Regions:
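N-terminal secretory/membrane targeting signals
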Residues: 1-24
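Hydrophobic alpha-helical membrane-insertion segments
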Residues: 11-13, 77-91, 157-162
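Hydrophobic alpha-helical membrane-interaction elements
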Residues: 24-50, 54, 111
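Loop-to-helix transition at the N-terminal end of transmembrane alpha-helices
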Residues: 35-43, 65-79
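Membrane-water interface regions at transmembrane-helix termini and the short interhelical loops
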Residues: 53-68, 129-149, 166-175
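Transmembrane alpha-helix boundary signature
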Residues: 86-104, 144-145, 166-177
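Membrane-interface helix-loop-helix modules in multi-pass inner-membrane proteins
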Residues: 87-137
Length: 214
């Protein structure tokens, strides 16, 4: 047992020393581009598992007859949010002028290269997973209380306007970033945006509001 402990400690020490020496080594721009892009893709895949978790959580909150509808709603939401965020949302989030509020409503094109340090498509993939997670928060909150097509319309608005604007305030270099605000994992930009969006929908609920009937 003691020998195994010493072996593990030795391996950990060797890894720490090698990682430190590797960090001190100057990496080429191409190498930084590859590793940074790979990091975005891996992070995006991990965040994507949140969507599966949200779907299972939401399915457990509803009656058995609604489970298939919930699954279809989550799959459709994922597709709609990805497409809309690609066309409009990404450029709107990162096109914010320094200290500004709203970016550019234009179709995004990837102009990244080795000098930028990462692929624009990898960052888009990573951020898209956060968009889907934000929409999933609202989806779970309105489970069995909203029709599927009105929710898809809401998901498109969320991915194309609501979330990108709030995201641009901090991650896009907007007024929150200029004020020193930091959000590393989306506690405000993702969860806060989803919660506020739901409360806005809830505040406008009426007996005649078709979105909430059936």
């Amino acid at each position: 047992m003691k020998k195994l402990t010493f072996i593990l400690l030795g391996c950990i020490s060797a890894l720490l020393i090698s990682s430190q020496s590797f960090a001190e080594t100057t990496m080429s721009q191409e190498g930084q581009y590859i590793f940074n892009s790979l990091g975005f893709y891996i992070g995006g895949v991990l965040v994507a598992f949140m969507a599966a978790g949200f779907c299972m959580l939401e399915s457990g909150l509803v009656t058995t007859k609604s489970v298939s509808t919930i699954a279809a709603k989550n799959i459709g939401k994922f597709a709609i949010c990805s497409l809309v965020f690609f066309l409009v949302g990404y450029n709107l989030a990162y096109g914010v002028p320094e200290g500004g509020y709203v970016g550019s409503f234009t179709i995004w094109t990837d102009s990244s290269n080795a000098e930028t340090g990462y692929s624009g498509y990898s960052d888009w993939f990573f951020q898209t997973m956060f968009v889907c997670a934000t929409a999933s928060i609202v989806s779970g909150a309105v489970a069995e209380r909203i029709k599927i097509w009105p929710f898809f319309i809401f998901a498109a608005i969320m991915a194309g306007v609501i979330y990108p604007i709030s995201m641009g305030w901090q991650w896009g270099g907007g007024w929150l970033a200029s004020g020193g605000f930091s959000d590393f994992a989306g506690s405000t930009l993702v969860h806060g945006c989803g919660a506020v969006s739901y409360t806005h929908l809830r505040a406008h609920q009426t007996d005649s509001y078709l979105v909430w009937r059936g």
